[in-house]
């Protein structure tokens, strides 16, 4: 079943209990997909005439007096339930990536030549897998159609970017050329990602996130996905130590709504506190906030109907008092 969302928040004032794997709205199924009554699709992004990014977001739930110090920006218990489901889904996605990565992510984690695997990981993060709503569709098909060996230049003109694509379609050639130049300067992609021997896994993430941010058109989402998945797959010792919530992107906008503040430092602190108390990996908040904010679940190459851990759901409900 495809998720259907609407720009209108649910009208109920009291949330139904979040069943393990349920959608938090009391609907059928075990996928954790968000549903409502309309059919208007939210959370899509497209290039503005000026080349910027349009950020659309789910309307707020009705204020029913809900309050939690962990998520002070939320005034609706329905919003809190929906957030729980998306955070737990994102955590389940990480488990699958670590244990049995699907599709092209499995190739990145495989035993082929490392330079080819890193190049493929870059293309996946840059182009972005499709949403995965249709179980018959291969979320990596657009990437597979344009992938070329390392050292060759792909033609991304015909590509329809995924929902978390990391490039401006009009500047993709600049982004690819800049990435290749970055790798060449380092000596190889491998050396570029390894960085300095003294780096801790968290330091490696932060420094690479900063360096890749100098590439034209390389968005926050693409950088975060590339580095976090390389760490999850065990390709390099890379670990997320903070969410880097800044700029105009769905994850940051959602974080500001959830945590009720715009200061970057405080956003990261509140995100870490939420992850710690809910016993979730901090990196799960990246995709979890994105999906909560847009109201449309995307899996980044992973099925969107993963069964949600009932114990994780219950921990989060206790933590958020909902």
What does each model-found stretch correspond to?
Residues 2, 6-8, 12-15, 36:
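Low-acidity, Ser/Thr- and Arg-rich intrinsically disordered low-complexity segments
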Residues 32-106, 181-207, 221-322:
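C-terminal accessory module of base-excision DNA glycosylases/AP lyases that mediates lesion recognition
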Residues 80-83, 89-159:
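Phosphate-/polyanion-interacting regions in eukaryotic proteins
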Residues 124-129, 212-215, 230-231, 255-259:
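Generic structural signal for hydrophobic core residues of well-folded globular domains
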Residues 133-214:
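Alpha-helical ds-nucleic-acid-binding substructure associated with the helix-hairpin-helix region
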């Amino acid at each position: 079943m495809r998720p259907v969302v609407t720009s209108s928040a649910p009208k109920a004032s009291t949330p139904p209990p979040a069943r393990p794997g349920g959608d938090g709205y009391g609907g059928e199924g075990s996928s954790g997909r968000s549903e409502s009554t309309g059919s208007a699709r939210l959370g899509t992004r497209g290039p503005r005439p000026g080349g910027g990014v349009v950020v659309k977001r789910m309307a707020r739930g009705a204020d029913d007096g809900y309050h939690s110090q962990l998520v002070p920006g939320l005034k609706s218990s329905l919003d809190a339930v929906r957030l729980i489901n998306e955070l737990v889904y994102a955590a389940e996605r990480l488990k699958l990536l670590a244990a049995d990565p699907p599709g092209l992510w499995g190739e990145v984690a495989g035993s082929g030549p490392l330079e080819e695997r890193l190049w493929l990981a870059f293309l996946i993060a840059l182009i972005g897998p499709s949403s995965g709503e249709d179980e018959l569709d291969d979320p990596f098909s657009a990437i597979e159609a344009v992938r070329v060996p390392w050292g060759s230049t792909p033609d991304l003109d015909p590509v329809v970017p995924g929902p978390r694509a990391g490039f401006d379609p009009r500047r993709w050639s600049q982004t690819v050329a800049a990435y290749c130049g970055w790798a060449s300067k380092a000596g190889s992609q491998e050396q570029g990602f390894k960085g300095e021997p003294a780096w801790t896994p968290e330091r490696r993430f932060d420094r690479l996130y900063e360096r890749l941010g100098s590439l034209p058109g390389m968005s926050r989402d693409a950088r975060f996905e590339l580095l976090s998945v390389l760490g999850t797959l065990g390709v390099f010792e890379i670990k997320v130590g903070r969410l880097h919530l800044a700029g105009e992107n769905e994850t940051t906008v959602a974080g500001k709504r959830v945590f009720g503040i715009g200061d970057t430092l405080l956003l990261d602190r509140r995100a870490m506190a939420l992850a710690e108390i809910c016993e979730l990996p901090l990196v799960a908040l990246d995709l979890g906030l994105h999906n909560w904010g847009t109201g449309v679940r995307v899996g980044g190459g992973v099925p969107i109907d993963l069964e949600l851990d009932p114990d994780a759901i219950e921990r989060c409900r206790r933590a958020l008092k909902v």
